[in-house]
Amino acid sequence: MLTNTDRQQVIAQYQRAPGDTGSPEVQIALLSARINDLQAHFKEHKGDHHSRRGLIRMVNQRRKLLDYLKRKDLTRYASLISELGLRR
């Protein structure tokens, strides 16, 4: 689970302006951090299917936001996926 300080660090790293918490970059980065955290959780708790449903929902939401960002601004999309290490 992400702590409040972890969330603030992610927001500070990806925000476009001070106080920005809703830009696609910030939302995608927060979802990616939560997804990575849950993936580590599933290595230990393989039978936790209830949380797995939430993980799939987060992955789908991130995919939608990435598609939106790609459609709106391709350069921001490309820089974000390289920073996050998505799409090798």
UniProtKB/Swiss-Prot annotation:
- Kindly state a single biological-process term from the GO annotations of this entry: translation
In terms of CDD domains, this protein maps to:
Ribosomal_S15p_S13e
Any Pfam family the entry gives:
Ribosomal_S15
InterPro entries recorded for this chain? Ribosomal_uS15, Ribosomal_uS15_bac-type, uS15_NS1_RNA-bd_sf
Q: Where is this region: Disordered?
A: 1-23
Disulfides per UniProt: none
Q: Which GO terms describe its molecular function?
A: rRNA binding; structural constituent of ribosome
The family note in this entry says:
Belongs to the universal ribosomal protein uS15 family.
How does this protein assemble? Part of the 30S ribosomal subunit. Forms a bridge to the 50S subunit in the 70S ribosome, contacting the 23S rRNA.
The record's annotation in HAMAP family points to: Ribosomal_uS15_B
Q: Which NCBIfam families match?
A: S15_bact
What is the protein's name according to its record? Small ribosomal subunit protein uS15
Q: Which organism is it from?
A: Psychrobacter sp. (strain PRwf-1)
